[in-house]
Each structure stands twice: as structure tokens, then as C-alpha cells.
Amino acid sequence: MFETNVILKRFDNPDELRTFDKGTFELLEIGGMTIGRVTYQPGWRWSEDVGAALGELHCPVEHKGMVVSGCATAAMANGEIVEIHRGDVSYVPQSPHDSWVVGDEPYVSLHFLGAASYARK
């Protein structure tokens, strides 16, 4: 007989849910790591909708992720500006940055690094 260690989870039943203006962040704890799915509505901006509640001007969290839908801009404090689109896999270093949704479609992405500390009050 075989022992199984397979774990299945779904974001529609997250282990933790963080909410903020114009967005939600669903977290799953699985296999010793935290994976997050974030949904930002059109008009969302990190500095206004997350950072303001935390008393921060810029996001300080390092991210590794993949965009499921929508488009966002990441603006680094050093002046680098990048648009991130559906299907992109990205790395944002632990350097101050702001971000905002581009267009009228909600932005949805998966976070493989940085999820545990993102938007934590």
C-alpha cells in the first residue's frame, strides 16, 4: 500500500484573506510555503490603497509572481518603470516601489515569494 502526501487547496477557500481598498489577497499555506493570489480592481494603486493604511509610501516587499489577467505598472524608486501583463512571470527586488492597475480590467496575479509579508498590518 502506498502512502500519499498530496495536498490540494483552492484560492476560493484561502487559509487567510487580507482585504484593502480596491483589492483582496488570498493566501494558501502549502508544502512549507505561502502562495498568494491578489486581485486589484481598476484604479487600484499600492501607495493609496495599501500603503496609506500601513503608513508606507512604497512597497518594501520582494516579489516573484505570475500575472493571471490584467496589466499593472511597477515603478521603482530608482526611476525604472515596467508594465507587467497577463502571462508575465516577474521578479521585483526588495527595493522601494509603487504599483498600479492599468486599464479597465482587474489585475490578478499569483505571488510565490513575498506573500507572507505582503499587506500585513
Where are these regions (language model features)?
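A short hydrophobic beta-strand segment most commonly corresponding to one strand
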Residues: 37-38, 91-92, 97-98, 103-121
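Conserved short histidine dyad/triad with adjacent acidic residue
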Residues: 37-59, 93-94
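Glycine- and acidic-residue-biased ligand/ion/polar-headgroup-sensing regions
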Residues: 33, 52-78
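A short, N-terminal "cap"/entry segment at the start of jelly-roll beta-barrel domains
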Residues: 1-39, 47
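Short acidic-glycine-tyrosine-enriched beta hairpin
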Residues: 76-95
